[in-house]
């Protein structure tokens, strides 16, 4: 079994791009196994002690439908002892009132499931009004704004 499960949606082009970049940077197929959200089940989340999960933020701060369909199932799991790092995409210019909320929504679910969130990053350098992804002055994951700060994704 691989040591890290990387969960994201294949049909979300920007999220897929960032997920593949993360996978390459962390050691590729020897270390990370991809689990596509469109095909994921509860036991997929139970299979890994370390997970990286990714999602974009849609519309008014919502998770994409492929995550929404899994949320009821995810809310019933207990993930105590498992570590979860979250990454997500947002657009701080077009959606400053709910920038990268998808990360925060996922974080809430994994926190309820008693997982340990890792990978907090600085919110410095971003311009926005509100975000559910903020914990104090930090993001509860890696925030990527490919539309306005694409150079930071490299």
Which residues are covered by each model-predicted region?
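Short acidic active-site motifs
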Residues: 39-44
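Glycine-rich NAD(P) Rossmann-fold beta1-alpha1 loop
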Residues: 12-13
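FMN-binding flavodoxin-like domain, especially the glycine-rich phosphate-binding loop
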Residues: 3, 17, 25, 29, ...
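Short, hydrophobic/glycine-enriched beta-strand segments
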Residues: 4-9
């Amino acid at each position: 079994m691989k040591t890290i499960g990387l969960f994201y949606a294949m049909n979300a082009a920007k999220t897929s791009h960032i997920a593949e970049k993360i996978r390459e940077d962390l050691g590729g197929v020897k270390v990370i196994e991809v689990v596509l959200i469109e095909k994921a089940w509860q036991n997929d989340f139970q299979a890994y002690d370390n997970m990286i999960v990714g999602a974009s933020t849609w519309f008014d701060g919502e998770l994409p439908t492929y995550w929404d369909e899994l949320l009821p199932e995810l809310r019933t799991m207990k993930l105590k002892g498992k570590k979860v790092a979250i990454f997500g995409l947002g657009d701080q210019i077009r959606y400053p009132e709910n920038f990268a909320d998808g990360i925060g929504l996922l974080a809430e679910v994994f926190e309820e499931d008693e997982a340990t969130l890792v990978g907090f990053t600085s919110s410095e350098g971003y311009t926005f009004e509100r975000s559910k992804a903020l914990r104090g002055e930090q993001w509860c994951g890696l925030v990527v704004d490919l539309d306005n700060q694409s150079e930071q994704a490299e």
